[in-house]
From Swiss-Prot:
Endpoints of the signal sequence: 1-31
Major place of residence: membrane
Topological category with respect to the lipid bilayer: Single-pass type I membrane protein
Motif (NPXY motif): 694-699
Top-level taxon in the UniProt lineage: Eukaryota
The name this protein goes by in its record: Amyloid beta precursor like protein 2
Encoding gene, per UniProt annotation: Aplp2
Subunit comment: Interacts with CPEB1. Interacts (via NPXY motif) with DAB2 (via PID domain); the interaction is impaired by tyrosine phosphorylation of the NPXY motif. Interacts (via cytoplasmic domain) with APBB2/FE65L. Interacts (via intracellular domain) with APBB3/FE65L2.
Length: 707
């Protein structure tokens, strides 16, 4: 009995030791990494791992490993970077005392407070995905496996994929098992933010309910401005940080609350909604930076008589999405429909694979030709399923894209109408005009950001296609730029109001210009030989504050004299430049337009183009005449060539008609010719030939000689 008790006590002690080791393993690993950081730095005990964060238009942030707090760029100049290699170099510059060997995108976003713009005092908090600066030899993350969860890992030495790609694969792997992704980590680095494998934990879907409810409660507690940031957070999921600054001004927000009762509903509330369908195709709450990982499946031949197994799950979410129109819940309904399609496709594939395995087991004793036919049948079935899934997903994404573009256009149109209404009010109120202008510029920026994100996604996935669409992207960006500048030029109708809000306008334009310069500089390395390449090479001119208004004397009573209410729908026949209805493709002929133009508020905002050369008070450049002369010269040369060709064709036709008519007259036989029955057949034939116009060339020659 004593021996038995001793053995039981020993077993219990071993179990407790193993339990303690299991509980302390993650903490020990993290502590070891922190101690390694401190030893590497030589500056004291580190409390945080080195990380950097970027937000375009604002200074880069990095973690102070001694304090654990986020600090701005020490040089005060560095903003968002362009490549992962630049991120690695920046990590090495920020942490020179550490041996930074690689970078890796973090799995979860962070909220950084007091994030300021360059040379600005305005600071706000933003939610971004930071980059981890990896020190020394790579150490994989320690993953916890909760109850009822499963641990998996994948290693492919022949594959070197990015962080986002591995995340997509593990998420799909969990969905295949009927689970959801709980956590994951990278294995075996093979490049900058590239790895040979990953390890991950999948849990039942009920495990994520608590975390989702916690996140929703936290979002409800945010202020109005922060809610705008959260909604724009759906945008911050590009393959590389290209977040544009969509923050609203805090002063304007406060003023809006003060004047809500006066303005009523004339200025429509501009909810900061935006969804990027090109980056958000594979987006989920676990990793907002996940890119689209599924392209169009290229199958040359599909067997059409293959019967696709029926859908095991209902398609209510998909049907509801297509049957209902767009609303404020567009993004949520799109996500639900997309997830439903993925689950349905996975179940179909699992069913086909299971049937394939069963058929192979039963076909072991069959001849080789029959087994080959069976294999081809299932291969065709798999291809048909993949093609159908790709088609359904493409239809879903295209529908969502069209709805998002329509929503952006509607909000931009409403913002422009409110801005025009504010200008036409009697008397005009400067603050209300500024507020409406900010909303309009914000709506234009949504469209610009939508276009930029689309191009950046295509550039990362298909550079060849990006090169083909670059001219279209730049044209659309120029259209947005000119449309916005022309709207600003409408302030010329009320110069005293424009002078009062001049500083706010300059600041607003400079903020938008900073983001635009960042994008144009990133794509200027890949020129495209198209018609608009001359405009693209110039890109966007450096920022000049908008001062189209003459200085006014303080002694003059300018308000009654300078104020001329704009008649709604008529507008600016005397004003240089105006709003006209046109397609965006005529942007290349913008310098040839008439100066007397009319505002028509019924026009779709997307179809308006403007003459931006006179918006900033700049004189029209004489070089603008050059393209007109060149086009005229080319048109004249083409016209002359067409005339020459037409004359030649007409000459050939006339000659042909004359020859044909001459031949017809030559074959006419005049009257009845009596034939001598005594003539020989040769003589009869000669007479017949002479009757039809035949002349003996010898006789004809002799006659000509006598003449």
């Amino acid at each position: 009995m004593a021996a038995t008790g001793t053995a039981a006590a020993a077993a219990t002690g071993k179990l407790l030791v193993l339990l303690l080791l299991g509980l302390t393993a993650p903490a020990a690993a993290l502590a070891g990494y922190i101690e390694a950081l401190a030893a590497n730095a030589g500056t004291g005990f580190a409390v945080a791992e080195p990380q950097i964060a970027m937000f375009c238009g604002k200074l880069n942030m990095h973690v102070n490993i001694q304090t654990g707090k986020w600090e701005p760029d020490p040089t005060g100049t560095k903003s968002c970077l362009g490549t992962k290699e630049e991120v690695l170099q920046y990590c090495q510059e920020i942490y020179p005392e550490l041996q930074i060997t690689n970078v890796m995108e973090a799995n979860q976003p962070v909220n950084i407070d007091s994030w300021c713009r360059r040379d600005k005092r305005q600071c706000k908090s933003h939610i971004v995905i930071p980059f981890k600066c990896l020190v020394g030899e790579f150490v994989s993350d320690v993953l916890l496996v909760p109850d009822n969860c499963q641990f998996f890992h994948q290693e492919r030495m022949e594959v070197c994929e990015k962080h986002q790609r591995w995340h997509t694969l593990v998420k799909e792997a969990c969905l295949t098992e009927g689970l959801t992704l709980y956590s994951y980590g990278m294995l075996l680095p093979c490049g900058v933010d590239q790895f040979h494998g990953t390890e991950y934990v999948c849990c039942p879907q009920t495990k994520t309910v608590d975390s989702d409810s916690t996140m929703s409660k936290e979002e409800e507690e945010e202020e109005e401005d922060e809610e705008d940031e959260e909604e724009d957070y759906d945008l911050d999921k590009s393959e590389f940080p290209t977040e544009a600054d969509l923050e609203d001004f805090t002063e304007a927000a406060a003023d809006e609350e003060e004047e809500d009762e006066e303005e009523g509903e004339e200025v429509v509330e501009d909810r900061d909604y935006y969804y990027d369908p090109f980056k958000g195709d594979d987006y989920n709450e676990e990793n907002p930076t996940e890119p689209s990982s599924e392209g169009t499946i290229s199958d040359k031949e599909i067997v059409h008589d293959v019967k696709v197994p029926p859908t095991p799950l209902p398609t209510n979410d998909v049907d509801v999405y297509f049957e209902t129109s767009a609303d404020d819940n567009e993004h949520a309904r799109f996500q639900k429909a997309k997830e439903q399609l993925e689950i349905r496709h996975r179940n179909r594939m699992d069913r086909v694979k299971k049937e394939w395995e069963e058929a192979e087991l039963q076909a072991k004793n069959l001849p080789k030709t029959e087994r080959q036919t069976l294999i081809q049948h299932f291969q065709a079935m798999v291809k048909a399923l993949e093609k159908e899934a790709a088609s359904e997903k493409q239809q879903l994404v295209e529908t969502h894209l069209a709805r998002v573009e329509a929503m952006l256009n509607d909000r931009r149109r409403i913002a422009l109408e409110n801005y025009l209404a504010a200008l036409q009010s009697d008397p005009p109120r400067p603050h209300r005009i500024l507020q409406a202008l900010r909303r309009y510029v914000r709506a234009e920026n949504k469209d610009r950001l939508h276009t930029i994100r689309h191009y950046q996604h295509v550039l990362a996935v298909d550079p060849e296609k990006a090169a083909q669409m670059k001219s279209q992207v730049m044209t659309h960006l120029h259209v947005i730029e000119e449309r916005r500048n022309q709207s600003l030029s409408l302030l010329y109708k009320v110069p005293y109001v424009a002078q009062e809000i001049q500083e706010e306008i300059d600041e607003l334009l400079q903020e938008q210009r900073a983001d635009m310069d960042q994008f144009t500089s990133s794509i200027s390395e890949n020129p495209v030989d198209v018609r608009v390449s001359s405009e693209e090479s110039e890109e966007i001119p450096p920022f000049h504050p908008l001062h189209p208004f003459p200085s006014l004397s303080e002694n003059e009573d300018t308000q009654p004299e300078l104020y001329h209410p704009m008649k709604k729908g008529s507008g600016m026949a005397e004003q240089d430049g105006g709003l006209i209805g046109a397609e965006e493709k005529v942007i290349n002929s913008k310098n040839k337009m008439d100066e007397n133009m009319v505002i028509d508020e019924t026009l779709d905002v997307k179809e308006m183009i403007f003459n931006a050369e006179r918006v900033g008070g700049l004189e029209e450049e004489p070089e603008s005449v050059g393209p007109l002369r060149e086009d005229f010269s080319l048109s004249s040369n083409a016209l002359i060539g067409l005339l020459v060709i037409a004359v030649a064709i007409a000459t050939v036709i006339v000659i042909s008609l004359v020859m044909l008519r001459k031949r017809q007259y030559g074959t006419i036989s005049h009257g009845i010719v009596e034939v001598d029955p005594m003539l020989t057949p040769e003589e009869r034939h000669l007479n017949k030939m002479q009757n039809h116009g035949y002349e003996n060339p010898t006789y004809k020659y002799l006659e000509q000689m006598q003449i």
